[in-house]
C-alpha cells in the first residue's frame, strides 16, 4: 500500500513514540525525513538519528530526547501543508511558532530550513510542520 503523506506519517510516529516514552523509533528512510531529523537534532528536539540498511530498504532510527526527570523535549508536532491543501509563506510573512519558542520547518528552493534560517536568508517556501 502506498503512503499518501510520508511526512505526516513521520511526524505521527515521532509523536506516538514520544508520548509513550520510547527511547527510539524506527521508520522508513527518505531524504526529506533525514533532513527533518537533522533540523530536529540541531534545534535540540531529538538526541540523534542514524540510517540503517534493512532487508527491504533503508530505515531511519531516531533517538528521542527526554529531560532528567523524563520530561519530553517535544511538546507538540503539527503538519501544516498537506497534499490536499498546500500552505506557502513568503519571506516577509514567515510563521512564528509560540512567539519564537517553537520551530517552523519550511521547504525552500535551497533545501529545508527553519523559520529563522529562512528569514535570515530571505527565502520563503512551503510550510511543512510546526514543532514546539
Swiss-Prot record:
Domain of life: Bacteria
GO process annotations (BP): translation
UniProt keyword annotation of Coiled coil present: no
Any one Gene Ontology cellular component term annotated for this protein: ribosome
Any coiled-coil regions, as ranges: none
One GO MF term: structural constituent of ribosome
Subunit description: Part of the 30S ribosomal subunit. Contacts proteins S5 and S12.
UniProt record similarity statement: Belongs to the universal ribosomal protein uS8 family.
Name recorded for this polypeptide: Small ribosomal subunit protein uS8
Organism for this UniProt entry: Mycolicibacterium vanbaalenii (strain DSM 7251 / JCM 13017 / BCRC 16820 / KCTC 9966 / NRRL B-24157 / PYR-1) (Mycobacterium vanbaalenii)
Originating gene: rpsH
Amino acid at each position: 500500500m502506498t503512503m499518501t503523506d510520508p511526512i505526516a506519517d513521520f511526524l505521527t510516529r515521532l509523536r506516538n513514540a514520544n508520548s509513550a516514552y520510547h527511547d527510539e523509533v524506527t521508520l522508513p528512510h527518505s531524504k526529506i525525513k533525514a533532513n527533518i531529523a537533522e533540523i530536529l537534532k540541531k534545534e535540540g528536539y531529538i538526541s540523534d538519528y542514524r540510517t540503517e540498511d534493512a532487508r527491504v530498504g533503508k530505515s531511519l532510527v531516531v533517538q528521542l530526547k527526554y529531560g532528567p526527570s523524563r520530561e519530553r523535549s517535544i511538546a507538540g508536532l503539527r503538519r501544516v501543508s498537506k497534499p490536499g491543501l498546500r500552505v506557502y509563506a513568503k519571506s516577509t510573512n514567515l510563521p512564528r511558532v509560540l512567539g519564537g519558542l517553537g520551530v517552523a520547518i519550511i521547504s525552500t528552493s535551497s533545501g529545508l530550513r527553519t523559520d529563522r534560517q529562512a528569514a535570515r536568508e530571505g527565502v520563503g517556501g512551503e510550510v511543512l510542520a510546526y514543532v514546539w
